[in-house]
Amino acid sequence: MPKILVLYYSTYGHVESMAYAVAEGARAAGAEADVKRVPELVPEEAAKKNHFKIDQKAPIAEPKDLLEYDGIIVGAPTRFGRLPSQMANFWDRTGGIWAQGALIGKVGAVFTSTATQHGGQETTLYSLMSSLLHHGLVISGLPYSFQGQGRLDEVTGGAPYGATTIAASDGSRQPSKNELDGAKFLGKHVAELAKKLTAQ
């Protein structure tokens, strides 16, 4: 049974919801899936003032946790078309793991949230992938066998580079069923790939 880590950062809860959907998909494929988050860097007083979702139940991840998993699926909201500092800080602490080549050959994938359809989803996914590629992970996208990618009857996230959701400028829009289905599909797909690779 492959072990999958869903590692995320979420400011207002949108990526958190997607993370649990990703984990659900991985478990549906027979994998063991853990959801963990990276540490918040914003002082608690400022986070509360800006209405951050601070009551997230997922445990805080440490870089050494990465070694325990066959697949690592990373999610974070956009910050001007790139990954946020909280997620960058986590990967900046993995130099020793990189030097050992300890993550080479594991399966990786990414997911994100933006305020609008054109708010930097694909560039954020690419920036999340960058650390995974430097660590030698085998990257999986969200294939078009997920039929929800081609929908034109609603405003929806989803890209071949990873699962996405649209939150609206004020954060009022929660992930839709189609977006959560895309997240589940991504988790299932990564789990199936990890199962094949670990069977070698």
From Swiss-Prot:
| GO MF annotation terms | flavin adenine dinucleotide binding; FMN binding; NAD binding; NADH:ubiquinone reductase (non-electrogenic) activity; NADP binding; NADPH dehydrogenase (quinone) activity
Q: Name one Pfam family in it.
A: FMN_red
Q: Which residues bind FMN?
A: 10-15, 78-80, 113-119, 134
One GO cellular component term, please give it.
membrane
User: Residues in domain Flavodoxin-like?
Assistant: 4-190
| Name of the protein described by the UniProt record | NAD(P)H dehydrogenase (quinone)
> Which SUPFAM superfamilies does the record cross-reference, listed alphabetically?
Flavoproteins
The family this protein is said to belong to: Belongs to the WrbA family.
Alphabetical list of HAMAP family matching this protein? NQOR
Q: Which UniProt keywords apply?
A: Flavoprotein, FMN, NAD, NADP, Nucleotide-binding, Oxidoreductase
Which residues of this UniProt protein bind NAD(+)? 12
Q: Which InterPro entries match?
A: Flavodoxin/NO_synth, Flavoprotein-like_sf, Flavoprotein_WrbA-like, FMN_Rdtase-like_dom, NQO
* Catalytic reaction equation(s): a quinone + NADH + H(+) = a quinol + NAD(+); a quinone + NADPH + H(+) = a quinol + NADP(+)
Which EC class does it fall in? oxidoreductase
